[in-house]
């Protein structure tokens, strides 16, 4: 996707060569030979430990913290603060618990739309994605540990804020983590060999694209399997933590137990994310053909104009 620079200053380093996948004209008699869509740099070759570091981050970012236990803790505080009348004063008037939760979700998603419009394109373009993932992860860790101080009903408003920010942090970290796997797949030794075969005319472009797709699917599916197995062990430890805190003894113990579980799962996430932060190779992303921020809005506009052409 190429376009004239709209006049905004570039916000990322130079990305990949936009001529990839074309036809190179040879010096002798106009001879043509295919150019592999992925030009390899030995510095960016994907290693086994880097792939496992990628999987490890997903084990940590399993959703137990800000997507499962945090919503439960938040709604617990709402019900306890509301009492028998089941209403609380929020956003200018008394509202039911369901209304408050729905409004909180709406606020969270509205902010996510804005965030993804502004920085979403950095997941695919330029070289900023790893740094953005680190920053967003730190925000998520801070929210997770902050729940240790929010476990009584009078702090339900603080819980509301943590709930909203936590949802945003979880979704954005997951998005920027997911965006790394095409680069991992296309820099594996297997895909490098396929690119050489394609450049030599041994395989067709369709065969190369099929190998690329299969490698990406392999990394994505294995990541899900590894994450699921790892989550089982985390949940087993969590059961022990619940008994240790004696969550069934009282409402206060149950509230405290949820906060402890959120913090524990956050600690696991933090530890498992460090290898990925250290071992990820800063590969260049795609070339947006324009300022990276503008590229996000351009993609939205293009989707809105092209969606009507989809077959029903």
Describe the role of every protein-language-model region.
Residues 21-112, 312:
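Helix-loop boundary and gating motifs at the non-cytosolic
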């Amino acid at each position: 996707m190429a376009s004239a620079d709209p006049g905004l200053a570039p916000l990322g380093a130079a990305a990949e060569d936009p001529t990839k996948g074309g036809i190179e004209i040879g010096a002798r008699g106009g001879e043509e030979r295919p150019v592999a869509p992925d030009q390899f740099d030995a510095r960016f070759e994907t290693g086994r430990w880097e792939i496992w570091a990628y999987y490890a981050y997903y084990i940590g970012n399993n959703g137990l913290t800000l997507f499962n236990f945090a919503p439960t803790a938040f709604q617990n505080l709402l019900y306890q603060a509301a009492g028998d009348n089941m209403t609380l004063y929020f956003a200018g008037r008394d509202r039911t618990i369901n209304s408050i939760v729905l409004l909180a979700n709406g606020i969270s998603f509205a902010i996510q739309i804005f965030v993804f419009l502004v920085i979403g394109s950095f997941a695919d373009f330029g070289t900023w994605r790893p740094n953005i993932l680190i920053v967003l992860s730190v925000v998520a860790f801070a929210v997770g540990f902050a729940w240790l101080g929010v476990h009584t009903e009078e702090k339900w408003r603080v819980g509301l804020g943590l709930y909203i920010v936590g949802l945003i942090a979880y979704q954005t970290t997951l998005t920027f983590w997911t965006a790394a796997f095409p680069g991992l797949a296309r820099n594996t030794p297997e895909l490098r060999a396929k690119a050489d075969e394609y450049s030599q005319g041994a395989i067709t472009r369709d065969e190369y694209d099929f190998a690329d797709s299969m490698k990406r699917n392999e990394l994505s599916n294995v990541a899900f399997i590894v994450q699921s197995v790892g989550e089982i062990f985390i949940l087993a430890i969590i059961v022990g933590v619940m008994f240790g805190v004696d969550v069934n003894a009282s409402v206060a113990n149950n509230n405290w137990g949820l906060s402890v579980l959120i913090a524990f799962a956050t600690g696991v996430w933090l530890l498992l994310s460090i290898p990925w932060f250290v071992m990820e190779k800063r590969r260049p992303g795609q070339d947006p053909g324009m300022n990276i921020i503008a590229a996000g809005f351009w993609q939205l506009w293009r989707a809105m104009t092209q969606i009507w052409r989809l077959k029903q």
